[in-house]
């Protein structure tokens, strides 16, 4: 819901929506913040096809932002699916937390925050 839509909803309805959203949070132990991406790479061999533009790969990496730095971490093919599932869980939970935060902000505006 947008902030303008939240302003039109009763406090009781906001509290009920917040409870429903909080109940939808799942598997916090599977939290993995980042973006799964695929990149091709060049090797160090002089006569290799990658020197002509045919890169090796694609290989999967997890791009994370931590300690004010962006980093990419290689994700082996054996854990690619699990890594992707963890990232999806995190994205779903973050979307729910964002909406819960917006509801709490609206409740604060109305002086109804518990």
For the regions a protein language model found, what residue spans apply to each?
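A positively charged, amphipathic N-terminal helix/segment that binds anionic biomolecules
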Residues: 1-114
């Amino acid at each position: 819901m947008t902030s303008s839509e939240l302003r039109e909803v009763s406090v009781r309805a906001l509290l009920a929506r917040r409870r429903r959203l909080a109940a939808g949070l799942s598997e916090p132990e599977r939290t993995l913040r980042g973006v799964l991406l695929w990149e091709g790479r060049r090797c160090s061999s002089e006569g290799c096809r990658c020197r002509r533009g045919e890169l090796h790969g694609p290989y999967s990496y997890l791009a994370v932002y931590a300690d004010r730095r962006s980093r990419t971490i290689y994700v082996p093919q054996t854990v690619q699916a699990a890594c992707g599932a963890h990232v999806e869980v995190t994205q779903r939970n973050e979307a729910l937390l964002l909406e819960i935060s917006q509801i709490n902000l609206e409740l604060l505006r109305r002086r109804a925050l518990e």
